[in-house]
Amino acid sequence: MHNQNDDIKSNIEKIKDYPIFHAGPIIRREYPFDNMEMKDRKKIFQSIFIFTLSLPIKIFSFCYEKKDFNDDLLKMQAKITKDVYNFLLDNFDFLNSFNEIIIYYDNGQNLITKILNGAFAISGLNYEFKKEVVPGSYRLFQVADFVSTVKLLEIKLSKNELSNSELKFVDVYHLKKNYIKGVNKKTLKR
């Protein structure tokens, strides 16, 4: 979450020469980072981390695994919708202090769009979906990608399921001490 009254132009200016950030391909050395050396990819990853920490933002993550729902997408959708709705209710006074909540989502997963719209629609909050969001156009969208990746790495670490490419990119000590700890400091408390 970012209050648009908090100017972040100077923060963005510091990383203006960096490419569009997408954490997974940076870690796995996939396009467009496939020809980049590890040290250069780590530099970009570290820069988006520092950028994230410098921002006046708050985050909250929801994490689910399909297998926990026996691959029943309707049950999963119901659970996620309920959790998002409860989050909105728990934080209603804070969220309602804004004239409007703008949701930046690229419609990458239709189910997520339905869940967000459903939960917000019954919450009583004034909201709008930003139309035609292109991830490369919004650094905050890229920050959300970074945060999601770190949260996923945190889950994989807790289950001892980090891949070889992830372990090669960032060791467990720095993952916990720097990235997970730093991202968790940005968490909006319920």
Where are the language model's segments positioned?
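Phosphate-ester processing/binding pockets and catalytic centers
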Residues: 1-190
